[in-house]
A protein has these predicted regions:
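Crotonase-fold acyl-CoA enzyme core
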Residues: 1-60, 93-94, 98-102, 108, ...
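Short beta-strand->loop
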Residues: 76-81
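Helix-loop "lid/cap" segments that line or gate small-molecule binding pockets
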Residues: 16, 68, 87-91
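Short active-site-adjacent structural elements
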Residues: 72, 112-113
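Short, charged, surface-exposed hinge/linker loops at domain edges
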Residues: 69-75
């Protein structure tokens, strides 16, 4: 179980980790441990919907966003800001950024190539 970056939730996360207690889904959703709360029959369709949406996005921007999300908290503020600026430069100068902008102008879905 990954700890939330919101310090207010550390107490609940610590309790669950240390006691091994279970949490009901509605409480997990209310506390922000879950992004979505769906019926069991809707779990796979909802998961696939989100996965397709992510897969349709610009690969470079998604890769860099993941890097900043997962590694960003490990760095001091100055380093994190430099990394964010570098990621933005890479993203804004990529082919995919131009393709995304052009697709918006042309009212069509972008065809990202990961470059």
């Amino acid at each position: 179980m990954a700890l939330p970056s919101d310090f207010r939730q550390y107490g609940k996360a610590a309790e669950l980790l240390f006691t091994g207690d279970f949490m009901e889904a509605d409480e997990g959703y209310r506390l922000g441990f879950l992004n979505h709360l769906v019926e069991e029959t809707e779990l796979e369709p909802k998961t696939m919907e989100i996965a397709r949406k992510i897969a349709a996005g610009p690969p470079i921007a998604i890769r860099l966003s993941k890097l900043m999300l997962y590694k960003g908290l490990e760095f001091d503020l100055e380093t994190a800001l430099k990394m964010a600026a570098a990621a933005e430069t890479i993203t804004l100068t990529s082919y995919d950024h131009g393709e995304g902008t052009q697709a918006i102008r042309e009212s069509r879905k972008p065809l990202y190539e990961g470059r």
